[in-house]
Amino acid sequence: MYGAYEFCNLCIENEIKPLIGLNCVWESASDKVELTIMATSYAGYQRLIELSTIISTNNNIVTTNDVKKYLNQTREVLVIIHANNKNIRYIKNNYDILNSTGHELVYFGLVPSDMDNITLLKSITSNIIPIDLVLYLDEKQHRIYQILQAIKEQKTLKSEDLSKSNEFLYKTKQDLMQHYPNEIIENIEKVIWLCNLKFPKNKPNSAELSLPKFTCPNNLTSNLYLQELCKQGLEAHFQSREIPETYVKRVLYELQVINEMGFADYFLIVNDYVKFAKIKNIMVGPGRGSVAGSLVAYVLGITGVDPIAYNLIFERFLNPERISLPDIDIDFEDTRRDEVIKYIHQKYGKEHVAYIVTFQTIASKMAIRDLGRVFQVNIEDINEMTKLIPIQYNFEIDMAIKQSPKLAWYANKYPLLFTLTKEILGFPRQTSTHAAGIVITSAPLVTAIPLQLGFQGIYQTQFPMQTLEALGLIKMDILGLRNLTILQNILQQVSKHYFLNLKLSQIPLNDEKSFSIIKNGDTTGIFQLESSGMRQILIKMKVDSLEDIIASSSLFRPGPQEYIQDYINRKLGKQKVTYIHEDLKPYLASTYGIIIYQEQILLILQKVAGYSLGKADLIRRAISKKILQLWKNKQTHLLKVLLIEVIHQELLRKYEKILKNLLVMDLIDLMLLLIH
């Protein structure tokens, strides 16, 4: 049922009535019978989810006991027995077994080649419908089906094997009338009338899909317990020193937002498994992404970066003006990540925890390899062709051909191969597991989500992440990072050979010897600093502070990249530091007057337009997609209009100079900052 939810929504958007069902093999006492079971209501859809989980964990097979138990428990599904020449001898017996459950919606399904059984079936019931298999809407697409089947089954083909066919084509009522009597065709309309699946207007099963309530000590509520942990964290951080008012106010503000949005349990759950990892001496990363802007996450020990010290903004993580799910990505040693997931699995239970499915889609390189094998193309040519496709054109084979004369030569040599590559690009090829994400729910997942067996006995969702988010599930990102494993091994070796119980937190962030290595570009193997381009920047910049490292990694990406030399010159005193307006100096002084970070964009919008930080982040998010589209279409003048539209007109006059300067600098680069 991988695409069931998305399919339903697309049908409804296009005013088509969705019919949702699944096929399974019923292993009866006499033979194996194929069944199609369809939902007649939302409750029936929920029962389909449960059945899908049963059959997905049992090789797509259900027993007689499974079928009888299932039909006894639900009346809101319709069952179709596939009646064919293989099982016709036992067809009445199988019908009687299903009918004995008292289920009224039992049908026989027929394909044209089995119409000689119609008389026997009519003697049992009048509930008979056509069940032609539909795989494509255009007979020209038959060859795509042939290709995908050959890839799946690892078969070979010749070009002459490819053909047009209407065998699995969508058939109109007139087409069906050529094969079936009217009374059978009319039963289709009856089935359509019986099936009335409608999803709730609100997110379905919101209570079931919510996070588990964290078990707090002393009968405290989640909100109060989180507040108590933050108080303890602040006191531990400042020890005997007085806690600055800015920290107290920031924590209280964040707690208010977290509690009002109902995410206290989320923080407690994340804090719990991070604490488990640290107790087990599993190295935990300092945090990545927008969660670094949360002081609550910092004082809990979830992250290791003080957001106040580094001017990070909480609203980029959790915006009180935008209902969105929090997203905390936590890195663990890659060799011990499974221990953390096992802990979560044991704590919350098998029925409540699952990995997330992903679908690997066919890109150009994969298509060339698959099609090359199917048509038995020389392996040396296949290898050469895939090397000639840049990663940025992996889904745009025509662009890759334009960029490479050698690839164009191969396209001329193998025209069918490249034509078919274009036709199968983007098709799902196989399922995989999300690299980091798991989901945890208060009620059993199977009440709302179809599951299948995943890694090490842990369930895997059949729905991908986008669908889970649409349903309201919160993803927990448990990442495995090789660099943390390397660091842990280094600490163990230091302890073993030098008898030092060294901790990374004890190493000063201004260590001169460390910066001597970095400024010389000796950073091979160091996360985010190891590419040749990055090493050149470190050398030219003469990096001597953590702020320089942060700036260099932020500059080394599309958009800000062209300001690298200006930044270096200003840092080294070779170029005067200027500001587009003196009012913005507090936000740009640390980066020598150059806009590098998203936080700076938000602060500028706050200053220039009078927005709250939450509103400023909304603006950034809302216009980013539009900006990207305009940028792709080279419509720079519209980009300027778009920027001006987000600024209050009454403030335009006061900050006219800022805006003019913003527009003088490469506006596309500025907008790319918003996107990134």
What are these language model-derived features?
Residues M1-H676:
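Alpha-helical scaffold/interaction cores of sigma-54-like transcription cofactors
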